[in-house]
Every structure is written in C-alpha cells, then in structure tokens.
Amino acid sequence: MAIISTKDLDIYFERSTPRANGPLLFLGGTGGDLRNKPNQLDSPLSEHFEIISYDQRGLGQTSKPSGSYSMQQYADDAASLLDELHIDTIPVMGVSFGGMVAQEFIKRHPSRVSKLVLACTSSGGDGGSSY
C-alpha cells in the first residue's frame, strides 16, 4: 500500500506477494476501489503473479483532479506508476473500463507491454461507452 505522486496526481497502488512469474499490471473497471475486499490482489492470479493494481484517477484513494479525464491521461497514469516502480516491460490485464485503458496504454507505450489480456471490455476510447 503506497502512493506515488506525478505532476498532477497522487496514485494509490498495492502489490501482492512477489511470485516466480513476475509482476502483472491489473487495470480494473469503473468504480474500482482497492479498499473493497476481496479484490484482484486476492484472486487466483496472485498465486502466479505479483499483482500490481491501483485506483485510477478520480476513484478510491487516488486523487480526484477537477475537470474531465482523457484516455491518454488514464494510460499515462499507468506509465507513471511503472516508471516509479522501475518496471520497463510488464504483462497487462485490463477488465471492463480497465480494458479500454489497457488498449490506450499499449497504443501509447507499446514497448512496455509484454502480453495483453482484455476481459469484458470494448474499444471504447474518448467518448466511447465504458459499459
């Protein structure tokens, strides 16, 4: 449980126990809040990967800047978190709205994604539906 600060955001994140398969970045859906238990850090995935997950901007314990947010900002928030954790390349799993963020993340930062898993999502994007 920790917070990293970027130029416009304080990002709350959590990590599960390190595992032999290394880390996996989990991007959760709309309304995701790591205070809700059980969550992705308690899932069967955590038996195989060190799950890194965070509350996206405007949600949970991450700060809530005024104004509207763009997919580019959501994707760059993930990159900022990985920068702070000194992780260059990582498998990424995005669920629901997190899947849309994952797609923007791989579009903007392709060299940072070793594998991509999308679940229960759509192409979405700015102006797209998140449900």
Ranges and model annotations:
Residues 103, 107-108, 114-131:
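Flexible "cap/lid" loop of the alpha/beta hydrolase fold
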Residues 52-93:
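Active-site loop/oxyanion-hole signature of alpha/beta-hydrolase fold enzymes
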Residues 23, 50, 88-91, 112-115:
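Structural signature of beta-strand start/N-cap positions in the alpha/beta core
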Residues 30-31, 96, 122-123:
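Short, flexible active-site-adjacent loop segments at beta-strand->alpha-helix junctions, enriched
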Residues 5-63, 67:
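Conserved HGGG/HGGXW glycine-rich cap/lid loop of the alpha/beta-hydrolase fold
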Residues 94, 98, 102:
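Gly/Ala-rich beta-loop-alpha elbow adjacent to hydrolase catalytic centers
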Residues 1-2:
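Residue-level detector of beta-strand structural context in well-folded domains
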